[in-house]
């Protein structure tokens, strides 16, 4: 893993600004710049994956390397889906880009954790509703699990 000190971070910021300046319009977006963006945002993937690995969400079901792999796959998908017009119009382009990519990376890692978590796989819409409510709607969760166990 790459460790960043202050000089490397300054170099990372200038490289990111140059890359975003080159890709103001979707027509100038090429495979080289796509690979450059993926490489530039890999430390973001590592950071997010480490946060998930140390939290209780991924304990026991996925290793840190699996989380980094899922995050990097979702980073590649997110870079392909970036709306460059929105990035060009925003005042702080780096912040806009990071927020978009981090949402996509976190969502992909959460989805991977949910699919690898237990013996019984829940449908994605059910896990999303449980995550949104975060256990507040215990009656709906209990009804769902009772319906599953009664059908067995």
Regions found by a protein language model. Name each.
Residues 114, 121-152:
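Charged, low-cysteine interdomain linkers and short loop/connector segments
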């Amino acid at each position: 893993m790459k460790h960043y000190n202050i000089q490397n971070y300054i170099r990372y910021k200038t490289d990111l600004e140059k890359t975003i300046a080159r890709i103001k319009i979707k027509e100038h977006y090429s495979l080289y710049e796509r690979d450059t963006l993926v490489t530039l945002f890999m430390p973001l993937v590592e950071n997010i994956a480490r946060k998930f690995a140390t939290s209780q969400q991924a304990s026991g079901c996925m290793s840190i390397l699996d989380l980094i792999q899922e995050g990097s796959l979702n980073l590649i998908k997110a870079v392909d889906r970036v709306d460059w017009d929105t990035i060009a119009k925003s005042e702080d382009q780096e912040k806009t880009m990071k927020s978009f990519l981090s949402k996509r990376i976190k969502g992909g890692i959460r989805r991977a954790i949910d699919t690898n978590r237990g013996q019984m796989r829940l449908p994605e819409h059910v896990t999303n509703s449980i995550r949104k409510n975060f256990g507040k709607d215990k009656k709906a969760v209990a009804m769902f699990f009772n319906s599953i166990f009664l059908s067995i």
